[in-house]
Structure formats: structure tokens, C-alpha cells
Amino acid sequence: MRIDTVNVLLEALPYIKEFYGKTFVIKFGGSAMKQENAKKAFIQDIILLKYTGIKPIIVHGGGPAISQMMKDLGIEPVFKNGHRVTDEKTMEIVEMVLVGKINKEIVMNLNLHGGRAVGICGKDSKLIVAEKETKHGDIGYVGKVKKVNPEILHALIENDYIPVIAPVGIGEDGHSYNINADTAAAEIAKSLMAEKLILLTDVDGVLKDGKLISTLTPDEAEELIRDGTVTGGMIPKVECAVSAVRGGVGAVHIINGGLEHAILLEIFSRKGIGTMIKELEG
């Protein structure tokens, strides 16, 4: 039993050396957020990353919690083409849940486990400048990222803090905008030229004929979208991953956040547990 523990540590050692001092952007959502054991394991993983010299930055979602709060307030959520229709009242609720509740819970749990986390949203220091998303028709205050101003993130990580970001952006019109957390995480990772972007999802990664694909290039990932292998909610995640890699991010990992310690298993082991998208070396 003891030698097994030693072997695990030895397997992790080259990765700890390789990633020391590097920035990881992690999108926290899905099963990892809903299952208590997975949520606790996520917090532990982030703390361990931090203590091995990695600089983690968290971007979180919270769609189910927003819908539940709306129902509690007697407002029925409305979706159009899979996107939440966000009028002014809904945007207030989105901001209340993401910034005022979920963000603070993540920060509290990280700090209770030995971290130094600080909660912010895209409006702080104009981190995320947004504009109205019109691709799916008029769905209200749903935004896309126009620009990322990462100076506040540099200031936080240089002072040993773990930034925890709620994906609420600020428009040049002064309005708040609800931004997809995967998209926000990808754009933030690009602005920082992060070593890794890790997307926690509800599935094991990119699948073909029910089997996990461990590694893909951006070109291969796009071909899987074109040929119908990648469908539904996985399409925007793969598109985010491709955009991030082509924008200078070292690699993107799509993993199942419902698996306890999914981040450590993916990053610190030879085999990994999900799909890694990166350019061919050389």
C-alpha cells in the first residue's frame, strides 16, 4: 500500500516540475457543482494545485441555481435555442445568484481549506467588457466577450491569491451581461496566455462511438463537429477549446467534473481521464 502511494507521487513529479509557476484557468460547473463529494474534491484539487506552485484561476457557472431562484421567486425561466432569455429582472437574479451566492460559497470553501481566494466578477476593474449576443436573436442581456482586461488578475495572482470569477460582464452601455462560463473562461485564458484551460463537464470528454478520445488537435476537433461526431452541448465547449488553443493557450482539457479529483487525475497522471486538445508539437 505504501509503495503504491510512492508510485503515485513519482508519477506526478514530472508534471509538478513542468507546471510550476504556470497559470491554469478552470471552469467550474455541471456535476462538480451539484454533487457534494465532487464539490469538496474540486476544492481540495485547487488547493493542491496552488501548493504545488501552479496559479489557478476559477471561472464558475450556475445555471441550475439561477433557474431555481427564479422559480422560488415565482418567475418561470424562458429559454430560446438553449439560451436563457435574460430581461432586466432576470439579469438582477443572475447577478444575485452568481456574484452574491455561488461566488462567495466557492471563495469561503477555498479559504476554509487553506487557500487565499478572492471573489470578483467581470464588472470589477472592467475585467470582461461585453456586448450583446445577437447570434440567437434578441435574448436580452446575454453577452459575448468583446475584450478582457486581465490586469486585476495579474495583480491577484502575483500576490498569491486565487481569483474566483463570476461571468457577469459590463457593457459599454453600462448594462450587466450574462456570459456563458465556458466562453468567459476561454477568453480569460487567452488573455493570460495560460498554460491550461480546464473545462469541467458532465461527460468524460469528447466521445466517438461511445469511446473517449484522449487527444485531439484543433483541426481534428473541428472535423468531429463537421462530421456530426460532436453534437449538442459539447459543440460550444469544443469550439471554445479550439479558440483557446489557437489563441495561445497551451492545452485545453475537457473532463468529467462529477469524478472526484478529476483535475488531479487529468493533470498529474500519464494517462489522464478526459480529452486534451492541443497543437501538435514540433
Curated annotation (Swiss-Prot):
Site annotation Transition state stabilizer: residues: K27, K237
UniProt signal peptide: none
Keywords tagged on the record: Allosteric enzyme, Amino-acid biosynthesis, Arginine biosynthesis, ATP-binding, Cytoplasm, Kinase, Nucleotide-binding, Transferase
Biochemical pathway: Amino-acid biosynthesis; L-arginine biosynthesis; N(2)-acetyl-L-ornithine from L-glutamate: step 2/4
Gene Ontology cellular component list: cytoplasm
EC number(s) from the headed UniProt entry: 2.7.2.8
Residues holding L-arginine: K196, S214, E266, I267, F268, S269
Annotated substrate binding sites: G62, G63, R84, N178
InterPro entries for the chain: AceGlu_kinase-like_sf, AcgluKinase_fam, ArgB, Asp/Glu/Uridylate_kinase, Glu/AcGlu_kinase, NAGK-C
Enzyme class: transferase
Catalysed reactions, as listed in the record: N-acetyl-L-glutamate + ATP = N-acetyl-L-glutamyl 5-phosphate + ADP
Superkingdom as given in the UniProt entry: Bacteria
Temperature dependence: Active from 25 to 80 degrees Celsius.
Activity control, per UniProt: Allosterically inhibited by arginine.
Record function comment: Catalyzes the ATP-dependent phosphorylation of N-acetyl-L-glutamate.
Family: Belongs to the acetylglutamate kinase family. ArgB subfamily.
Name this polypeptide is given: Acetylglutamate kinase
Origin species: Thermotoga maritima (strain ATCC 43589 / DSM 3109 / JCM 10099 / NBRC 100826 / MSB8)
Record gene name: argB
